[in-house]
Amino acid sequence: LSYCSVSGCTVLREYRDYRENQGNNRIFEFAAAGWNRDGLALRAVDWLLRRSGEQQRLLLILTDANPNDDTRLPGTGNQLFSRDYSGKPAVTDAAEATALRRHGNPPLCLFSGREGDLSSARTIYGRDVVRLPSVGWFAQTVGKIIQGRLQALES
């Protein structure tokens, strides 16, 4: 699944339904595009996972932990005026990852961003953050994580 925001709409793309036997190569169609409204995407992922009916899930999220969108956050409560969807307000919105945990879908953050955004990753995803220093570490790191999570599910 990937997401991006374009012209005020967040587009979710499902590359493969895990009930199908084909489509493994669709992930290679991924292209980075648009803005990233992480809070909305995380709420959508939570909804999709809860309705899937699967009992055991592994949710890995590759992110730079820098949510940003050109559509502003509306004013609410004591905040009368709209705000940019960036910085602290966007990170607070993206902290919807806690709802995923509450619903039995704990996300594991694969952080590929700048060192300065690591604190945002921890605010959004809690202690389940793994730092990927470079793309070269991706396969080895993710392989070990998946192996560890699968072993934990078996016990």
Which ranges hold each PLM region?
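Acidic, glycine-rich A-domain
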Residues: L1-S155
